[in-house]
């Protein structure tokens, strides 16, 4: 909800005029997908080190979640929400990410509703060092140039 309010405020103030690409990293992938799934005025979506399903992610940290409501699942389950994303999509993930497995990036990619979608698994990259790779910026530039 907050992401929509901020986006609407920026649009109403003419701060967002041309092509708009929304990017979310790690837990920020959830509000990114929330926007991209529900808005038609977004040109592109980038997910960096995003999760697919929050339950296994939380349980790997030692917390137990017994039950979620359908509303909670709809809000936080990226692998379901990404089905509604129609804009071009780039998913980037580190092959050595031990916090959020690269398998989750593959799940998101497989479930994505976008007709134009790219999955980039960067070798030798973990969860917090992706920006240090030259290929990171090359990949982003190639995607942005294609929009």
Q: What annotation goes with each model-predicted range?
A:
Residues 1-14:
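Alpha/beta-hydrolase active-site loop
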Residues 96-100, 127-129:
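Acidic catalytic loop of the alpha/beta-hydrolase fold
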Residues 125-137:
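Catalytic histidine-centered segment of alpha/beta-hydrolase-like enzymes
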Residues 106, 110-128:
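Catalytic histidine neighborhood in serine/cysteine hydrolases
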Residues 78, 87, 101-110:
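Short alpha-helix in the alpha/beta-hydrolase fold that links the catalytic acid
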């Amino acid at each position: 909800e907050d992401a929509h309010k901020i986006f609407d405020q920026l649009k109403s103030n003419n701060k967002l005029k041309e092509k708009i690409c929304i990017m979310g990293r790690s837990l920020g992938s959830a509000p990114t997908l929330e926007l991209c799934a529900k808005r038609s005025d977004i040109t592109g979506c980038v997910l960096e080190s995003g999760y697919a399903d929050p339950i296994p992610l939380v349980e790997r940290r030692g917390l137990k979640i017994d039950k979620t409501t359908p509303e909670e699942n709809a809000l936080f389950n990226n692998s379901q929400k990404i089905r509604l994303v129609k804009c071009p999509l780039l998913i980037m993930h580190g092959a050595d990410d031990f916090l959020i497995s690269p398998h989750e990036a593959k799940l998101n990619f497989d479930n994505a509703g976008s007709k134009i979608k790219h999955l980039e698994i960067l070798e030798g990259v973990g969860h917090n060092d992706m920006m240090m790779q030259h290929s990171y910026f090359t990949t982003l530039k190639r995607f942005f140039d294609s929009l």
